[in-house]
Curated annotation (Swiss-Prot):
Main location (coarse class): membrane
Localization (cell): Cell inner membrane
Topology relative to the membrane: Peripheral membrane protein
One GO term describing the cellular component: proton-transporting ATP synthase complex
Cysteines paired by S-S bonds: none
One Gene Ontology molecular-function label: ATP binding
Protein name per the record: ATP synthase gamma chain
GO BP annotation list: proton motive force-driven plasma membrane ATP synthesis
Organism, as annotated: Mesorhizobium japonicum (strain LMG 29417 / CECT 9101 / MAFF 303099)
Alphabetic keyword roster: ATP synthesis, Cell inner membrane, Cell membrane, CF(1), Hydrogen ion transport, Ion transport, Membrane, Transport
Length: 294
């Protein structure tokens, strides 16, 4: 049984931890608001970009004018996975859920005899995936020093992916991230970004219905410029969704930790008071017994 001094030290230690988790919860709440606004602002642009690409693709009928980034290599032997996670932990199962989705995808591909290559964006995903797939990891993108995510960060990742595609390093690229739904709900998502895949979009989903468009310059030339830009936009959206999801998960995790610390403090305080009461009672009995002996 721990002594009263040990219990006092444990209560003080848990109280100090509770102050830290409470402060981290408040910081995450402040950052969440900004991250959520950024993620929600990026969604309409990203969706509109997909709509424009679908319209142009219909205009050329998916013919020979379509760039390779849209049509693909015609093979699916080599898959590149861009796995986006957080740089830091203390956010519950946020990182492990994304990594689990990626690992399941890797296992399916390997079972089908495919070759897999990985780019890790974020330290936590890298730490998880390198345990079993270190030889498949081509690169790790470090964003720890980035205070505010910008389009330039996503563009650098997209250009790296496009460069690898142009060199024939892979056939299909899939982006893994967590889509932000709410503070308590982040959905791990896998999105194919190469080939772009908008050529297969249903006609009903394309804005404009039966409208006729005229393009200048030629649709193929427009696509050659828009598709790399669209890949950058999709990566940027994934990073913003991840940032909002991370802050939501961290806020929730720190709230749970703060409440658990409070419960632990209550239990330790009850134990401390009972032991102190028992000790006082024992001392009183000894004093009374001594007085009676006299």
């Amino acid at each position: 049984m721990p002594s009263l001094k040990d219990l006092r030290n444990r209560i003080a230690s848990v109280k100090a931890t509770q102050k830290i988790t409470k402060a981290m919860q408040m910081v995450a709440a402040a950052k969440l608001r900004r991250a959520q606004e950024a993620a929600e602002a990026a969604r309409p642009y990203s969706e509109r970009m997909g709509s424009v690409l679908a319209n142009i693709t219909q205009a050329i009928g998916g013919g020979g004018d379509a760039p390779a980034l849209m049509t693909g290599t015609g093979k699916d032997n080599v898959h590149l996975l861009v796995v986006c996670t957080a740089e830091r932990g203390l956010c519950g199962g946020f990182n492990s859920q994304i990594a689990r989705l990626a690992r399941d995808h890797i296992r399916r591909l390997l079972a089908d005899g495919k070759q897999v290559k990985i780019i890790c964006v974020g330290k936590k995903g890298f730490d998880i995936l390198r345990r079993d797939y270190a030889s498949m990891i081509l690169d790790r993108v470090d964003l720890r020093e980035v205070k505010t995510l910008g389009f330039v960060n996503a563009d650098a990742i997209a250009k790296k992916v496009i460069h690898l595609f142009n060199e024939g390093a892979f056939d299909i690229c899939t982006l893994f991230y967590s889509q932000f739904k709410s503070v308590i709900s982040q959905v791990p998502t896998a999105q194919q970004i190469i080939p772009a895949g908008v050529a297969s979009a249903p006609a009903a989903a394309v804005d404009g219905g039966n409208a006729v468009y005229e393009y200048e310059p030629e649709p193929g030339e427009i696509l050659s410029d828009l598709i790399p830009r669209n890949i950058s936009v999709q990566v940027f959206r994934a990073l913003l969704e991840n940032a909002a999801g991370e802050m939501g998960a961290k806020m929730s995790a720190m709230d749970n930790a703060t409440r658990n610390a409070g419960e632990m403090i209550n239990k330790l305080s009850i134990t401390y008071n009972r032991q102190r009461q028992a000790q006082i009672t024992k001392e009183l009995i000894e004093i009374i017994s001594g007085a009676e002996a006299l």
